[in-house]
Amino acid sequence: MAHHEEQHGGHHHHHHHTHHHHYHGGEHHHHHHSSHHEEGCCSTSDSHHQEEGCCHGHHE
């Protein structure tokens, strides 16, 4: 029956993976904020901002 206990330990490892996924989700939200900043760059008539390559395609 000792073998059965070892299998249970593997299941516990899966629980740890769930915690890691939650952390990654938070990071993804930060990336979305960057997209919003890009839109604002295009709307702004700042030559300095355009040089950054934020709205390079829109300049054409």
UniProtKB/Swiss-Prot annotation:
Q: Where is this region: Disordered?
A: 1-60
What ranges cover the sequence repeats? 38-42, 51-55
Is Ribonucleoprotein among the key words of this record? no
Biased composition (Basic and acidic residues) is annotated at: 36-60
Extract the GO molecular function terms from the UniProt entry: metal ion binding
Q: Which InterPro entries match?
A: Hpn-like
2 X 5 AA repeats of E-E-G-C-C: annotated segments: 38-55
Sorted alphabetically, the keyword list is: Metal-binding, Nickel, Repeat, Zinc
Q: Which stretches are tagged as biased composition: Basic residues?
A: 10-35
Record function comment: Strongly binds nickel and zinc. Binds other metals less strongly: cobalt > copper > cadmium > manganese. May act to increase, or at least to preserve, urease activity. Exact function is still unknown.
Q: What is this protein called?
A: Histidine-rich metal-binding polypeptide
> Gene encoding this chain?
hpn
